[in-house]
């Protein structure tokens, strides 16, 4: 007798081994039809999986996150099937699930075209409509290698040949197409109804630039048509908001080939940067942080002690001088430990909070670089708190409250919280981990935050809280973090004198709110579609005259506003006022002041707010009051 335990606590008993599909049918015809896969004892499996002993089972449908992954994985195989039908000489390589979709890499004698993409998508729909069963078979490694060699799939044969000889491999077949895959997959192609091929790109085989350039086809797949339409609409909106386009259009910054992964900041863009930095400096000052500055380049010996040389060397920029090896810092923490350890510390000094606007460099692969979102040189609002285990809770509560306020001020009110707990390989005692994890969770409970637990996703040196922002068009951005570290202070010799006069090692909390300034400013630009709020806008007000007769008064108004601390541009060009208004509106300025004879004679200004909102005529003092209130409110 086999007992199958279901998520609602009920049980089903069977005399003989039973498949996931059979259990679903036993529960109800509707569930049997909706079943895409199953989760047996925590593992996602095909509906054909045979349950041979007492097990926990949940049936996965398109309402589950795992169901969407199965749909996307199976759609990647459907894409490969369609390509092989249309282009029999193409060779298939790999096709994983990615965020919001999938891709598949192909080797083919000529580049695919946009017209090919349309034909492939049409063929995919035809194959899905056939509702062909998707079946799984397991073969010894060497048999699988020979099979793929026999059908001319050299890349698949190479992948399988790299697997240990004593391991079996699983293959999935739908119609005439067979692919190597761990699975699971949908039971038949008819389950794949909503998909779209998105774009073509190049990708090196195995990610190595010495290998052949393959052709990558990206696609998206969803459970429901409405979900796909919403996603495509979001992509259209994201395209309009792309910080790379807006950076050029608004004269904020640019990129060029001579500096991959680095940014050329223009005066307006650097003004935005300075506003962000000045704001974060006040955050440091108001919350008990001491600002520090550590060297950007450090000797190899320090990186060896910290563990970075062993675990992170390929991502570090290195150099040599006078027979010594150095590296540009990829992160700020070792430098902060040096500052802490430079003096004899007492328990009375703890918690000791350091903050730095630290410039870091990481040798990211060129193919992964993306505007300001993925760069090689960046500045972090990096802070480290040295404390005792008993102080972790209070520090995390204070940090979460601070982070929430900062995000609100920048226009982000939707924050997702995640606690990443201990991995299998870790340093530190179980008791210390218990205490740290409990403190992180309790800090979110005390802060009134809803959160999820991610078991095993902490770093080897400690658990962490991740703070993810949801932007104006629904995209998620992981930004802030607070990370407990049991390892680095000990590795780098940080100690303090405890109350009992013994020397102890402090706990180190790594924390960042914005993360990378570059990435965060890119997010700000996209979240606000370039229309930055008044307090952040590089130019807050443009003063325009209608004719030369008002030029002196316009200059006087502008000078008055500048003295009050506002960033003002005066446009006295001999152009039509409608042209000047339109030009400054395109630059997304918060306010435009128009001055004609009436305004000059009355000592007033005509004010337009962004979005062509006419606020009418008012005295300059009233405008200043309005502007100050708006800056103060960070609206």
UniProtKB/Swiss-Prot annotation:
It is an enzyme of class 6 (ligase). The keyword Heme does not apply. Its cofactor is Zn(2+). The keyword Ligase applies. Its main location: cytoplasm. Its EC number is 6.1.1.3. GO terms for biological process: threonyl-tRNA aminoacylation. It catalyses: tRNA(Thr) + L-threonine + ATP = L-threonyl-tRNA(Thr) + AMP + diphosphate + H(+). It comes from the Bacteria. Keywords: Aminoacyl-tRNA synthetase, ATP-binding, Cytoplasm, Ligase, Metal-binding, Nucleotide-binding, Protein biosynthesis, RNA-binding, tRNA-binding, Zinc. Binds 1 zinc ion per subunit. GO terms for molecular function: ATP binding; metal ion binding; threonine-tRNA ligase activity; tRNA binding. GO terms for cellular component: cytoplasm. Homodimer. Belongs to the class-II aminoacyl-tRNA synthetase family. This is Threonine--tRNA ligase. It comes from Herminiimonas arsenicoxydans. The lineage of its organism: Bacteria, Pseudomonadati, Pseudomonadota, Betaproteobacteria, Burkholderiales.
């Amino acid at each position: 007798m086999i007992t199958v335990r279901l998520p609602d606590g009920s049980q089903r008993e069977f005399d003989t081994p039973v498949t996931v599909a059979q259990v679903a049918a036993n529960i109800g015809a509707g569930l049997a039809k909706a079943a895409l896969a199953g989760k047996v004892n925590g593992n996602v499996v095909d509906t054909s999986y045979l349950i041979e002993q007492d097990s926990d089972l949940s049936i996965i449908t398109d309402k589950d996150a795992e169901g969407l992954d199965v749909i996307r994985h199976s759609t990647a195989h459907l894409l490969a099937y369609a390509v092989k039908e249309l282009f029999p000489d193409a060779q298939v390589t790999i096709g994983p699930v990615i965020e919001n979709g999938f891709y598949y890499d192909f080797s083919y004698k000529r580049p695919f075209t946009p017209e090919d993409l349309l034909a492939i998508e049409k063929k995919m729909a035809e194959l899905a409509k056939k509702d062909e069963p998707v079946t799984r078979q397991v073969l010894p490694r060497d048999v699988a290698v020979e099979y793929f060699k026999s059908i001319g799939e050299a890349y698949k044969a190479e992948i399988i040949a790299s697997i240990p000889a004593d391991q079996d491999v699983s293959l999935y077949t739908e119609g005439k197409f067979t692919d190597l895959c761990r699975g699971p997959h949908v039971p038949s192609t008819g389950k794949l109804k909503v998909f779209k091929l998105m774009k073509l790109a190049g990708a090196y085989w195995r990610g190595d630039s010495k290998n052949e350039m393959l052709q990558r086809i990206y696609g998206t797949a969803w459970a429901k048509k409405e979900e796909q339409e919403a996603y495509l609409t979001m992509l259209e909106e994201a395209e309009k908001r792309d910080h790379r386009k807006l950076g050029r259009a608004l004269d904020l910054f640019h990129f060029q080939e001579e500096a991959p992964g680095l940014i050329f900041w223009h005066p307006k863009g650097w003004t935005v940067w300075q506003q962000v930095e000045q704001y974060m400096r006040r955050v440091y000052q108001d919350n008990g942080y001491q600002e520090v500055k550590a060297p950007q380049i450090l000797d190899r010996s320090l990186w060896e002690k910290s563990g970075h040389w062993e675990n992170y060397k390929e991502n570090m920029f290195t150099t040599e001088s006078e027979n010594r090896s150095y590296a540009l810092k990829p992160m700020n923490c070792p430098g902060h430990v040096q500052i802490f350890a430079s003096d004899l510390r007492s328990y009375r000094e703890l918690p000791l909070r350091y903050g730095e606007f630290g410039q870091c460099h990481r040798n990211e692969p060129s193919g992964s670089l993306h505007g300001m979102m993925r760069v090689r040189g960046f500045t972090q609002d990096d802070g480290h708190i040295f404390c005792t285990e008993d102080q972790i809770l209070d520090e995390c509560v204070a940090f979460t409250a601070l982070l929430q306020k900062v995000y609100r001020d920048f226009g982000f009110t939707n924050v997702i919280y995640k606690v990443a707990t201990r991995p299998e390989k870790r340093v530190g005692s179980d008791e210390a981990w218990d205490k740290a994890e409990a403190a992180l969770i309790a800090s979110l409970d005390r802060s009134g935050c809803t959160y999820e637990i991610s078991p095993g996703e902490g770093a080897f040196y400690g658990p962490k809280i991740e703070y993810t922002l949801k932007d104006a068009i629904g995209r998620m951005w992981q930004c802030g973090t607070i990370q407990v570290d049991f390892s680095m202070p000990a590795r780098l010799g940080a100690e303090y004198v405890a109350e009992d006069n013994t020397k102890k090692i402090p706990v180190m909390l790594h924390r960042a709110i914005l993360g990378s300034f570059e990435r965060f400013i890119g997010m700000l630009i996209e979240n606000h579609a370039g229309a930055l709020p008044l307090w952040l806008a590089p130019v807050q007000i443009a003063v325009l005259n209608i004719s030369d007769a008002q030029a002196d008064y316009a200059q006087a108004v502008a000078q008055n506003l500048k003295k009050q601390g506002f960033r003002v541009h005066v446009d006295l060009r001999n152009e039509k006022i409608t042209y000047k208004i339109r030009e400054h509106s395109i630059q997304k300025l918060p306010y435009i002041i128009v001055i004609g004879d009436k305004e000059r004679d009355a000592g007033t200004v005509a004010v337009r707010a962004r979005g062509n909102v006419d606020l009418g005529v008012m005295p300059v003092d009233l405008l200043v009051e309005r502007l100050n209130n708006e800056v103060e409110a960070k609206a």
